[in-house]
Amino acid sequence: MAKSKAYRAAAEKIDLTKAYTASEAVELARETGSSKFDSTVEVALKLGVDPRKADQMVRGTVILPHGTGKTARVIVFATGPAAEAAIAAGADEVGGDELIEKVAGGYTSFDSAVSTPELMGKVGRLGKVLGPRGLMPNPKTGTVTPDVARAVSDIKGGKIEFRVDKHANVHFVVGKASFSPEQLSENVGAALEEIVRLKPSSSKGRYVQKATVSTTFGPGIPVDVNSI
């Protein structure tokens, strides 16, 4: 597929023979982002793990110090006092059986789902709807919890999830092109620190093998993995 004129113009600013530091890459990403809208800045990593092995599955969450630039839409499966707490924390939609039935019918107009442990027996049956979209609540990411208010606050405050795919790649958002270079660099640093902390003990050799920074529809900017 032919690349757009804007893409080609952005690509010309990038020296593909050079590996940029993370701070240089985010600065360049800001410069090469679309002038028509506030582009999302993303990071992609290739990790030295074998995702087929359970002990090498890298998955986690991190609260970006400057958020993502987008207010996440969060639904919560809860009843009683927990539901009231979720509403007070700013959840966009809260409910028990009725909300479960709504999602079972195909409703997915949200960015994250949280559930109390008590309702997971029912929520777990929504796997066909939530699973493929990465929206199924999970204790490992803090989205199955008695403290649903805290979960909502964290997500609204810039919490992101990351998970290695079957090709050992990890993709995550670190902000908008309108962020300052310092804000983007600090967000990238926070995410990378957590991903490096989660390196499986059974992973041998170089852990972060390749890294790129890009904006929406923009070219990937190679990052020197030694700077990570």
Curated annotation (Swiss-Prot):
Gene3D superfamilies: 3.30.190.20, 3.40.50.790. One of its GO terms (cellular component) is large ribosomal subunit. The keyword Methyltransferase does not apply. It comes from the Bacteria. Keywords: Repressor, Ribonucleoprotein, Ribosomal protein, RNA-binding, rRNA-binding, Translation regulation, tRNA-binding. GO terms for molecular function: rRNA binding; structural constituent of ribosome; tRNA binding. GO terms for biological process: regulation of translation; translation. InterPro entries: Ribosom_uL1_bac-type (IPR005878), Ribosomal_uL1 (IPR002143), Ribosomal_uL1-like (IPR023674), Ribosomal_uL1/biogenesis (IPR028364), Ribosomal_uL1_3-a/b-sand (IPR016095), Ribosomal_uL1_CS (IPR023673). HAMAP family: Ribosomal_uL1_B (MF_01318_B). Part of the 50S ribosomal subunit. Binds directly to 23S rRNA. The L1 stalk is quite mobile in the ribosome, and is involved in E site tRNA release. Protein L1 is also a translational repressor protein, it controls the translation of the L11 operon by binding to its mRNA. NCBIfam families: rplA_bact. Belongs to the universal ribosomal protein uL1 family. This is Large ribosomal subunit protein uL1. The lineage of its organism: Bacteria, Bacillati, Actinomycetota, Actinomycetes, Micrococcales.
